[in-house]
């Protein structure tokens, strides 16, 4: 786990460590979409909200998929990750086959006409952000792990198992961590 922070870059998964108990990030899996000297930005993948995209986002009245809590920053903003950078203008590639943002009106049209499927996009309310040096400090106290990302993880609906599966994918000692109870003091 030494120098784990040095592996962090856009397109990696950020996994809350088993001892990170802060409610916003407890057992979360995030995709990092931006990481540079100014800070880091990502979205929580395993926190679907109680309401659907069609109930909260204008122009997407036909989309019955859940909206996801992207993080505690600017929770009045909507963001999206998708796999269709080939047909959405202004999208930023995070890794091959995964894109962030783009023309919202174009996305609405593509979804409403069936050119794009709801399974190819994930919507988030707010985001997770860290200023310069903040995330590095959190790594130093053991709050986070890094793992490889894939489109399968990004678009998975297995929210309850996403954290343990992602931690387990790191192998070795992480396989034990992945099976740790949420509140070991109660055992």
Swiss-Prot record:
Record-annotated disulphide pairs: none
InterPro entries found in the cross-reference section: AlgH-like
GO cellular component: cytosol
Protein origin, superkingdom: Bacteria
Transmembrane segments: none
Pfam families noted in UniProt: DUF179
SUPFAM superfamilies according to UniProt: VC0467-like
HAMAP family: UPF0301 (MF_00758)
Protein family membership: Belongs to the UPF0301 (AlgH) family.
Name recorded for this polypeptide: UPF0301 protein Cpha266_0885
């Amino acid at each position: 786990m030494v120098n784990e922070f040095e592996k962090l870059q856009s397109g990696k998964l950020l996994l809350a460590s088993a001892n990170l108990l802060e409610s916003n990030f407890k057992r979360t899996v995030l995709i990092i979409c931006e990481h540079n000297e100014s800070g880091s930005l990502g979205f929580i993948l395993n926190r679907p909200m109680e309401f659907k995209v069609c109930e909260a986002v204008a122009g997407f009245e036909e989309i019955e998929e859940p909206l996801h809590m992207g993080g505690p920053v600017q929770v009045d903003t909507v963001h999206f990750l998708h796999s269709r950078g080939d047909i959405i203008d202004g999208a930023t590639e995070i890794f091959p086959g995964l894109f962030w943002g783009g023309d919202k009106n174009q996305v609405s049209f593509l979804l409403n006409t069936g050119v794009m499927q709801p399974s190819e996009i994930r919507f988030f309310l707010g985001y997770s952000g860290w200023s310069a040096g903040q995330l590095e400090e959190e790594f130093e106290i053991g709050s986070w792990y890094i793992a490889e990302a894939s489109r399968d993880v990004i678009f998975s609906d297995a929210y309850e198992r996403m954290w343990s599966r992602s931690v387990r994918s790191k192998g070795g000692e992480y396989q034990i961590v992945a099976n740790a109870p949420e509140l070991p003091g109660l055992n």
